[in-house]
Amino acid sequence: NLEVPRASEEETWNQVLADYDKAIELMMSSSPKSGYSNKYVALAFKSEAMLYAGSVAKYNETVTGRLTGLGTKTGVRVIGFDEDRWQEASKKYFTEAYKAASEVIKSGVYSLYKKKWAANDPEAQYQNMVDMFSDLSNNPENIYVKEYVYPTSTHAYDSYNLPLTFKAPLNCGVCPTADFVELFDGFDRYPDGTLKVTTGNSCTEGNYVMYDSPMDYYKNAEPRLRAYVIFPGDVFKGKEIEIYAGVYTGAAPVKPLLSDYSY
């Protein structure tokens, strides 16, 4: 039979849960060597998967006539959860996510990376988070790490994402968006919550706010944001990063290039 009915989404997540539980049962508590899995790696992945499953169960929606979630031949719900099942399923998956994460925490094997962290010191907190991603020497926060070694096991992440300052062959492929930056504290804002860049009540009103240095705009930004995003004028790998989106030279009011200047 080449037309075996697909399992429902709930059945699929239940199988994922069972597979993780079996892996947790069979695996050792410690990795035999760096880069290998162990019981707590499986628990961490299980927690992440069950958090996603619980979110799908609780928040999924269907669009009538466009996305029903039901197979046309079998009527099996292959997308989302039935109305009489989502509450129970989401509670089950969220509980499994919590239990798995709690077991990892209570094991004492892993902990937050705080080698350079210091209370009330934004610069130390920023540097601590930067180092967290590159310090592989006894980093207590690393649960599972995929290691790369030149020339046998490499990646092209830097080539695709480095700023133009470094003249990488494929750089600037990924840039953070303004709405991502808006998720963090430390900025002046318009009444609607967006980042304030002019003297008016919106980005289409008033004059641009002027700074002596591009970094002045970010001086109060959360340390973790600075660790995630390279700001114009910040120093990265020993170089000052120049990022421009045009140069404003006059005192004239803002004149949008397009009819809608918002982002």
Where in this protein do the model-derived segments appear?
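Flexible helix-coil transition and linker loops at the boundaries of alpha-helical arrays
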Residues: 25-35
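Active-site-adjacent "gating/activation" loops or surface patches in catalytic cores
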Residues: 254-263
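Mobile, glycine-rich extracellular loop/lid and propeptide segments
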Residues: 1, 15, 19
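Generic anion/oxyanion-binding catalytic loop in active/binding sites
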Residues: 5, 31, 86
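The tetratricopeptide repeat
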Residues: 1, 35, 42-44, 49
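N-terminal cofactor/phosphate-binding cores enriched in small/glycine residues
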Residues: 1-5, 25
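An aromatic- and glycine-enriched ligand-binding surface/loop that stacks and positions planar moieties
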Residues: 13, 21, 40, 48-254
